[in-house]
Amino acid sequence: MGIQIIGQIERINGKELSYGDFAERYLAKNQPVVISDLTEDWRAREDWVSENGNPNLHVFATHFGKSRVQVADCDTREFTDQKRLEMSVTEFVEQWTNKDSIEESVLYLKDWHFVKEYPDYTAYQTPPLFSDDWLNVYLDNYQMHEDRDSFQKYDQISCSDYRFVYMGGKGSWTPLHADVFRSYSWSANVCGKKRWLFLPPPQSHLVYDRYMKNCVYDIFEEVNETKFPGFKKTTWLECIQEPGEIIFVPSGWHHQVYNLEDTISINHNWLNAYNLSWVWDLLWKDYKDTEESIEDIRDICDDFEAICQRNLAANTGMNLNDFFLFMSRFSLGNMVLLQSYSDKHKNLNSCSLAMAQNLLMNLSTILKVMMKMISAGGVTAEEVYLDLRETLEDPQFLRFVRDMGRTYARIHMEEEDQFLSSKELLQKLSGLAGPNMQICSPKDLVEMINHHNTFSSQIYFI
């Protein structure tokens, strides 16, 4: 059974695209696009590519060879994904370069946390179009899971950030999937060429079985019509991604990817105000699925909810408590930036209106999602809370806010501001929380954001 391709992904020159236009045309509308001319000055495109345009594997074996990486065996299916092997980069390069038989498996190095492992090697700089990245700026400063004892070391490494390097020979591929957390992703070809097939979100149900549990693995193999009765109705968009091009993958778009040549790519998953509702919807769905899967032990288990949260974190990458703390810290960080800007700039000529609008939109979006969380049941663990006094005096939080400020200054082409001292911030923000200065529930966070946005809207006339 062949697939029906009905169109191609739009292409655009990145140098002719402002952040505002990108946000309006692609982030807000959740539409894919191929973007050119944003990678020419990357170190990776110089160091990692041979003169003939192929991957410079010698560089990886020489400088990064001891790194332990996950490698997919593209010819072997294991449950719902390709079989994974662990090896060093040197071992991977040796197997790649010594492959002399068509009977040998095609290997694909995936999900290499290169930036986290080599922070002093600046292989590339994230383009401003993709810099409003709540996920990775948060994980640069905090662990996703507060209850660290409940998670194995591998889980901590795998959730340390969502910035990856992929390397694979011609014929390597990735099965049909939608991205983690239903996040956005961007993928830049350092060298090589890829073929992408995209399925629009309204058709997602057509690639699942009648129970919405199992997804089609490979859209080019013979798909079982009894198991996947809707698959024959799917219509696809296609894209051939050339070297140096970046593809933006929106939330909820299932896709399957083939390397048409030996390829190296850089890939980020990220989320922000434009797709936060996608993240929450998936998290709540996965929570209910987790709850249902162990329902038979509810009456005999004293810590049923804790088990649900632990299983959710293991399967989805974060649980409800992780998400609540993430949103609480990020909200407070936005408030700190807005308070600092409003105090230091007495008129809008000195402060970017676009930046203020961006920060207020962030808070308004989090508020809406917290309202959904309240309706759904919210956070139940009593120990999950954010103490404002402790947080505003915490050097780790101040580094987090500094990183946020640097990000938004870069996006909106503003000078980076110094924000207020912890003492000044406590004085300004103390009236926004309850008398105990704690955010203990989604309801507390909603009230705090409402109070803050009322005040800030008056300042910025937004």
Curated annotation (Swiss-Prot):
Its cofactor is Fe(2+). Residues 115-287 form the JmjC domain. It catalyses: N(omega),N(omega)-dimethyl-L-arginyl-[protein] + 2-oxoglutarate + O2 = N(omega)-methyl-L-arginyl-[protein] + formaldehyde + succinate + CO2. Its EC number is 1.14.11.-. One of its GO terms (cellular component) is nucleus. One of its GO terms (biological process) is regulation of photomorphogenesis. Mostly expressed in leaves, and, to a lower extent, in inflorescences, roots, siliques and stems. Disulfide bonds: none annotated. SMART domains: JmjC (SM00558). Fe cation binds at residues 177, 179, 255. Disruption phenotype: Plants missing both JMJ20 and JMJ22 exhibit reduced seed germination efficiency during PHYB activation after red light (R)-pulse treatment due to an impaired H4R3me2 removal-dependent derepression of GA3ox1 and GA3ox2 causing lower endogenous gibberellic acid (GA) biosynthesis. Induction: Repressed by the zinc-finger protein SOMNUS when PHYB is inactive in far-red (FR) conditions, but derepressed upon PHYB activation by red light (R). GO terms for molecular function: cis-regulatory region sequence-specific DNA binding; histone H3R2 demethylase activity; histone H4R3 demethylase activity; metal ion binding. This is Arginine-specific demethylase JMJ20. The gene is JMJ20.
